[in-house]
A protein has these predicted regions:
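Nonpolar helix-loop interface/hinge motif
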Residues: 2-57, 121-124, 174-241
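Selective recognition of hydrophobic, aromatic-rich stretches within alpha-helical transmembrane segments
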Residues: 2-7, 11, 81-118, 159-199, ...
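Alpha-helical transmembrane segments of multi-pass integral membrane proteins
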Residues: 143-152, 188
Length: 242
């Protein structure tokens, strides 16, 4: 019988390479529960989102065909309303899917860290309390995040209007980008720990500035990998439209 590998510790200082190794080791060890619970939660949303995207593409093509023929304002108006409806539904489902997937992944990681048995024998019913807790917290982070973006956008717009020198405005935008990097660990801190959202924000900045370069590198690498996987999975759908 193969000996079980040591549990992957969360709260450990690691180099950049060790962070990537720990991430892929966790996925390799727990890909079955990750796949199972993701399918349970995301498949219904994906089906509805696929229908809305199909309606959106069909409506777009139909509207494009109308431009080459006779113009009927009532038909065009109805087609535009249908496009807005399909796109709104697609956006809402995308938002729900992002919230559900984020909440699920962090619930599984926290459960893995707290149980001696790791994720062995974990059921969706066992995850439900933690999952609902994470959903509420992710929505709260999104709301406060949108407010912060609007606030910063107003400040940037005001500075760009008042200060005539574009170099100063550019430096301010660059400063905003630098300060925004620690926000990448705001959600992990808030979802992993039982603390208030403001305390999580303070801790994210304290830890984020200390590991600023690592956060940027991890974000770039993971974003690159996600883009490749997304491109591969979208090939079939795009080829079907050609």
């Amino acid at each position: 019988m193969e000996a079980q590998k040591p549990k992957i510790a969360l709260y450990v200082q690691r180099s950049f390479g060790e962070k990537l190794t720990a991430t892929f080791d966790f996925i390799k060890e727990n890909w079955k529960p990750l796949m199972k619970f993701t399918t349970y939660l995301m498949l219904p949303l994906c089906l509805l989102q696929g229908l809305s995207l199909n309606g959106l593409m069909s409506g777009t093509m139909a509207l494009g065909d109308m431009t080459g023929g006779s113009f009927d304002s009532s038909v065009v108006g109805a087609s535009i309303m249908a496009l807005v409806t399909y796109y709104s539904l697609y956006a809402v489902l995308y938002l729900l899917g992002t919230v559900m997937l984020t909440s699920l992944v962090y619930a599984l990681v926290r459960t893995y860290n707290e149980r001696e048995e790791r994720l062995e024998g974990v059921t969706l019913g066992m995850l439900k309390p933690l999952l609902f807790r994470n959903v509420r917290r992710v929505f709260l982070i999104m709301i406060i995040g949108v407010l912060l973006v609007l606030f910063v956008g107003l400040i940037v717009g005001f500075i760009a209007t008042v200060i005539p020198f574009m170099a100063i405005a550019f430096l301010f935008v660059l400063l905003v980008v630098v300060v925004s990097v620690p926000l990448a660990i705001w959600a992990p801190v808030y979802l992993f720990e039982d603390i208030y959202i403001i305390d999580a924000l303070k801790k994210a900045y304290r830890l984020g500035f200390a590991t600023w370069g690592g956060i940027v590198l991890i974000s770039i690498v993971m974003g690159f990998i996600a883009a490749i996987l997304q491109g591969v999975t979208m090939i079939h759908g795009i080829s079907g439209l050609l």
